Curated annotation (Swiss-Prot):
One of its GO terms (biological process) is mRNA 5'-splice site recognition. A motif (DEAD box) lies at residues 450-453. It comes from the Eukaryota. This is Pre-mRNA-splicing ATP-dependent RNA helicase prp-28. Component of the U5 snRNP complex. It holds the Pfam family DEAD.
Length: 728
């Protein structure tokens, strides 16, 4: 044979590469047409039918032959021509002796096992004859192992607890036939060199809430320039200008800023809602203006703002923020605010703006009465309001006069001889002046009722009604929607008088107060600051269960001697005759003390308050007479030597401290006689953020449920009755 016809040896690398390609092609999913699938299905069914027929032909017959008449075991004769016996056997009678049990009976299970072993051995021997010549040694070794196993089973018994586990039976899974769900690199159609995908384009359509960046804006402007050589430059400039204006508008809206960082014109409804929540302002009524955020943003005249700054009012209180804008629109107002919230300035400043627009008092009109009237329940509160009003009215040239009991009518008539724009009075003494023709209200068009609920509690409903009925009716507001229109209510009636404006400030709204408000106020705006009847958060409330006068005096001495509280200090008692007793004991402790109750004359009351305010006296011992409306600066401690008979009086007592944003402490002594108010006391303390309800009060039986019966009242408990208790 020549060298040209000689076969070249196969290339191993080529074979491996070809095999890998075939495997990869087989692993990849391939689409098969429908006709091809039908043909393959028919071929598969034909093969299965052929295989089934072949198996039926090879199935053995009952006589041990197949369909061809041959023996299934390959033996053609009944005689065994195997000349070799591997295992020697004994006589037939003794061959199965070992298989018998103790009673001479054979063990059927062992007999069957040995018979099976012999059949296997004979079958192996017969199969050895049919094996290929190159498998003789392997088969001979296998037969020897079987013979050894048979001998062991015969003479040593069967193997017990032999594991049938075989490691060869474990099949290892290969990844050859595992389906690959990933795309092959050849299937990628987004080729980098494709010009379509060479430069990615940003979509111009955006979903809601998407903000275009400066880079995208410049890119779009550049695309406009390239796409339109003629007018592209101008269009791109207009597009950038439009984007700049939109951005400025968004910055003006800027909902993310806090209301304190925004300008007044940028405030939205959401900002005003947050503002009111921050200051605890709640308003009710139609056409109510927004509160003022600062003094500078109010519509008060510049001259009045300068006076406010000189007085020391840096920031308005919540009631001032809400009430002043409403009052400046000539609206009737009901203010419900906690004690010590700055109500006095809230109604004084709009009052001064109102009367500054009226003609000044002259010799011709000074006898027609004042322009404004302020009513208060107690003499001390009247004098306090008068003092506060003079701070603002005197620089503006207005006169303020107080009319209270305890002074002679001649003295007060002399004070009114030159007329007064503002009169501050108690209802009782003011009715006396009206009945004696010392005063008229012919031109009074501004009325303020401070502590209206307190005036009703003291029995001033009838005097209050007489005073309000004495007001002129020609300038009374209509009870229609026009009363809510600030433009209409700011006009003059018949060219000379303005519409009458009435305001009422109260801590609670009992039915009598509501009836008066409904009768004399027209479509009022209602302003509520915080929760009515609750103590301010600047007062830390403490309660102690101390029964007996002696124990309470001893505990009071311990508190005063602790050095934690500086003067002035106020001690409240329920019965006015106890004032002098407690004051005498306090003086025995080494402290100066004065008393204030209904039996004191007006001169004594004024002297007591003046000595406390001036620092000449350390401690004031008083009944509820001083518990409401009295403003003594820097009171550090209030001691309720006797718990008030109702929770409203308790609230006003402790309101004497913690005023004007300062902190204070209120300590209350409790006894068995106070069970009727323990439930309300627990509730009001639990609502305070700086106070803690003591365990003894929390577990007390009377503090668990609100009492059903009426509250217990002590004789002369309020300090207003008895000799010398007249308010006039």
């Amino acid at each position: 044979m020549s060298t040209t016809s000689r076969r070249e040896p196969p290339d191993l690398a080529a074979l491996l590469r070809k095999k890998k390609e075939e495997e990869a092609a087989a692993a990849k999913p391939r689409f098969i047409p429908k006709k091809e699938r039908e043909r393959l299905e028919a071929e598969k069914k034909a093969k299965e039918e052929e295989e089934r027929k072949r198996k039926e032909e090879a199935k053995p017959q009952p006589n041990g032959t197949n369909h061809n008449g041959n023996r299934m075991d390959g033996i053609q004769s009944h005689h065994n021509h195997n000349p070799q016996r591997n295992i020697p056997t004994g006589p037939k009678a003794m061959r199965y002796d070992d298989d018998r049990g103790p009673n001479g009976m054979s063990n059927g299970r062992d007999y069957r096992d040995n018979r099976d072993n012999r059949d296997n051995r004979d079958r192996n021997q017969r199969g050895a004859k049919r094996g290929a010549p190159n498998d003789d040694e392997e088969k001979r070794a296998k037969m020897e192992r079987n013979d050894e196993a048979e001998l062991r089973a015969r003479y040593m018994g069967p193997v017990v607890n032999q594991s049938t586990f075989s490691a060869k039976k474990k099949r290892r899974r290969t990844a050859a036939n595992k389906f690959n769900f990933d795309w092959d690199a050849d299937d990628d159609t987004s080729r980098p060199f494709d010009p379509i995908y060479a430069e990615r384009q940003e979509p111009l359509v955006r979903l809601g809430g998407y903000e275009m960046t400066e880079e995208m804006v410049m890119r779009k402007a550049e695309a406009i320039r390239r796409g339109d050589p003629e007018t592209g430059e101008e269009r791109a400039r207009q597009y950038l200008e439009q984007h700049r204006r939109i951005k400025e508008m968004e910055q003006r809206k800027n909902l993310g800023k806090h209301w304190s960082e925004k300008k007044l014109e940028d405030m939205k409804e959401r900002d005003w809602r947050i503002f009111k929540e921050n200051f605890g302002i709640a308003t009710k009524g139609g056409a109510i203006p927004n509160p003022m955020r600062s003094w500078e943003e109010s519509t008060l005249p510049r001259r009045l703002l300068d006076i406010v700054k000189n007085v020391g009012y840096d920031e308005p209180t919540p009631i001032q923020r809400a009430a002043i804008p409403i009052a400046l629109q000539a609206r009737d107002l009901i203010g419900v605010a906690v004690t010590g919230s700055g109500k006095t300035a809230a109604f004084l400043l709009p009052l001064l703006v109102y009367i500054s627009e009226l003609p000044p008092l002259t010799e011709y009109n000074k006898n027609d009465g004042p322009y404004a009237l302020i009513l208060a329940p107690t003499r001390e509160l009247v004098q306090q309001i008068e003092s506060e009003a003079k701070k603002f009215a005197t620089p503006l040239g207005f006169t303020v006069v107080s009319i209270v009991g305890g002074h002679s009518l001649e003295e007060q008539a002399f004070a009114l001889r030159n007329g007064a724009e503002i009169i501050v009075a108690t209802p009782g003494r003011l009715v006396d002046c009206l009945e004696r023709r010392l005063l008229v209200f012919s031109q009074c068009c501004y009325t303020i009722m401070d502590e209206a609920d307190r005036m009703i509690d003291q029995g001033f409903e009838e005097p209050l009604t007489k005073i309000l009925d004495a007001m002129p009716v020609t300038n009374e507001k209509p009870d229609t929607d026009d009363a809510e229109n600030p433009q209409l209510m700011s006009r003059y009636v018949d060219g000379k008088d303005r519409y009458r404006q009435t305001m009422m400030y109260t801590a609670t709204m009992p039915p009598i107060v509501e009836r008066i408000a409904k009768k004399y106020l027209r479509r009022p705006a209602i302003v509520t600051i915080g929760n009515a009847g609750e103590a301010v958060d600047t007062v830390e409330q403490r309660v102690e269960f101390v029964s007996g006068e002696d124990k309470r005096k001893k505990r009071l001495q311990e508190i005063l001697n602790s050095g934690q509280f500086k003067p002035p200090i106020i001690v409240f008692v329920n019965i006015k005759r106890n004032c002098d007793m407690v004051a005498r004991d306090i003086k025995g402790m080494g402290y100066s003390a004065v008393t204030l109750h209904g039996s004191k004359t007006q001169e004594q009351r004024e002297a007591a308050l003046a000595s406390l305010r001036n620092g000449q006296t350390d401690i004031l011992v008083a009944t509820d007479l001083a518990g409401r409306g009295i403003d003594v600066p820097d009171v550090s401690l209030v001691v309720n030597f006797n718990m008030a008979t109702n929770i409203e009086s308790y609230t006003h007592r402790i309101g004497r401290t913690g005023r004007a944003g300062k902190s204070g402490v209120a300590i209350t002594f409790l006894g068995p006689e106070d069970n009727d108010v323990l439930y309300d006391l627990r509730q009001i303390i639990s609502k305070s953020s700086i106070s803690k309800v003591p365990d003894e009060l929390r577990r007390h039986e009377a503090a668990q449920n609100k009492p059903q019966k009426g509250q217990k009242k002590l004789e002369e408990s309020n300090g207003y009755s008895g000799k010398g208790g007249s308010w006039n």
